Amino acid sequence: MLDREGFRPNVGIILLNARNEVFWGKRLREHSWQFPQGGIKYGETPMQAMYRELHEETGLLPEHVKIIGRTRDWLRYEVPDKFIKREVRGHYRGQKQIWFLLRMLGRDCDICLRATDHPEFDAWRWNEYWVPLDAVIEFKRDVYQLALTELSRFLRRPAQRADKPRGPRLPRYPRVIAAQPAETLTIVDTSVVCSEVEVEASTLDEMPPRVIVGK
């Protein structure tokens, strides 16, 4: 479903924990990280699409989160031709997004990246609100910056953004929460305990090749 200008209606999600850290998901079998997002289906409202995408990509339910804010209008980004299927080139230009800022009310172990048969992410982590966006695919960086900036006014304690962000860049994670590889996965009764394995990684390249986060 495209608008007259060739943009697909979409929702983006910035998910915060109690420390105002932001959820980042590593795209399946890639070395790029992004926020949950997805298209709005015909007949859906942006809020309905947001809750559906939230569950599909993170396993979280409406009771696990609270809506803090949303962008006033659509934010757009164009997709380079090399990422567009040949049959829709000339018609499809990119995405227009309504962004939601959510506060997570549940626990980390409520996050499950295998909530559907087609997961988007194979690892996830919390990171500070303001970080360099080097690990985000280039054509999405501007819209990420716009969404983070507009929604920062809803933070409980507004994050202070330095002119020159300091600290490690997004790809360099000291701790990445990840489950065991599928061939060694231990079945755990999640009604009793939430079990996670923390994989040490100084850079993305050092992460295990088959990492699935969540239950």
From Swiss-Prot:
It is an enzyme of class 3 (hydrolase). SUPFAM superfamilies: Nudix. It holds the Pfam family NUDIX. PROSITE patterns: NUDIX, NUDIX_BOX. One of its GO terms (molecular function) is pyrophosphatase activity. A motif (Nudix box) lies at residues 38-59. Its EC number is 3.6.1.-. Keywords: Hydrolase. Its cofactor is a divalent metal cation. The keyword Hydrolase applies. The keyword Hydrolase applies. Residues 6-149 form the Nudix hydrolase domain. HAMAP family: Nudix_RppH. Accelerates the degradation of transcripts by removing pyrophosphate from the 5'-end of triphosphorylated RNA, leading to a more labile monophosphorylated state that can stimulate subsequent ribonuclease cleavage. Belongs to the Nudix hydrolase family. RppH subfamily. This is RNA pyrophosphohydrolase. The lineage of its organism: Bacteria, Pseudomonadati, Pseudomonadota, Betaproteobacteria, Burkholderiales.
